[in-house]
Amino acid sequence: MLEIKDLHKSFGSHEVLKGLDLSVQQGDVVAVLGPSGSGKTTLLRCLNFLETAQSGTMNFDGDLFNLKYITKKEISSVRKKTAFVFQNYNLFRNKTALQNVTEGLIIARKLPKKEALEKGMYALDKVGLSAKYDAYPHQLSGGQQQRVAIARALASDPEIIYFDEPTSALDPTLIGEVLSVMRKLAEEGMTMLVVTHEMNFARNVSNKVIFMMDGEIIETKTAKDFFNNPEQACIKAFLRTYLNNDEGSQSYELRRVNEEV
């Protein structure tokens, strides 16, 4: 479905992504983990063309693109199949929940208003917010705002959704409602690439984990193998730090990791 090869991205003289290779199959839920500053968000932004890569190729549904020389028309064709959920919601403050969900459908996709409204209400219902269709962002909690953002992504019928730390801006008491929606999407077969520090989500919902450090992917494993059989010392240290702060009990294997580091 999605394959990236030799992705490079620099800001000035600082190389942020150092020749990344990755693949995502239909139905995959891929957790992108790693310490702050490892390039996780930049990776997502390059995949959705919010940043321009210096080099690399993308194969999306059999169509091959050179990421350095990709055209606006090609970008548009890929974006029609993708959606992006930002960590800070990025909602229009002066528009209702439904208007936020349908804005892109009407303006960018040129859908008839009636069809856009139907899609918008269906998407809001999927995230449990159909009753809040006429509420403005300031009338919603942070968790509800992020669910509106997810509904906006769903309304475009994407093949894959990119999530950039979707719970990092939320009060801890609101994180669960967003993760619950994401878990439901995973169960329904939605393909997702998720930058997150929510270890329980990565362990229990994702089927694949990518671990990044200093602009490189240093490990790609199934979620089970990543959490139960970490091999590199830096990954063991990372898990020890974040699992001690994550909610829920740890398995025997995860406790063993903490003891070994």
Language-model features and meaning:
Residues 65-83, 113-114, 229-230:
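ABC ATPase NBD coupling module
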Residues 48:
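Helix-to-loop junction immediately C-terminal to a conserved catalytic motif
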Residues 136-140, 144:
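Conserved ABC ATPase signature
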Residues 161-164:
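Catalytic Walker B motif of ABC-type/P-loop ATPase nucleotide-binding domains
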Residues 155-159:
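A short, proline-enriched helix->beta-strand linker immediately N-terminal to the Walker B motif
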Residues 56-66:
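Conserved ABC transporter NBD signature motif
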